């Protein structure tokens, strides 16, 4: 039930992002926030509070320091705000739901790439198709990017494979 709910509200939130938004400096140097962050966050919070009033909400702009509770929704309204603000496609809306202390469903929507990821106890899906990790026959064939600048990492990956 919660999985279908977060899929629906994230799809609805995507529709809010079809116009230009103002960009502001936030907190530390280089940290940005846009009107889109606030718009999507308010929209998602209102939907969650109406449907799940007893669940806590943790969100990057609204309540970032709240402790994760047994029953809560965790929101990043625009993950990749710098990319979003600069017109780059690597950004997304993220929502996860915890119930009875377990993360039971999550969504990552990347509208600019037309990618919609959903995961729950039955697996992970991209645009409705089940996905899984690729088998790595030997450790030296394994490639991982951890932390850092996603754009720089993607550029290196394209250049060097």
Residue ranges and their predicted role:
Residues 87-91:
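Catalytic core of PPM/PP2C metal-dependent serine/threonine phosphatase domains
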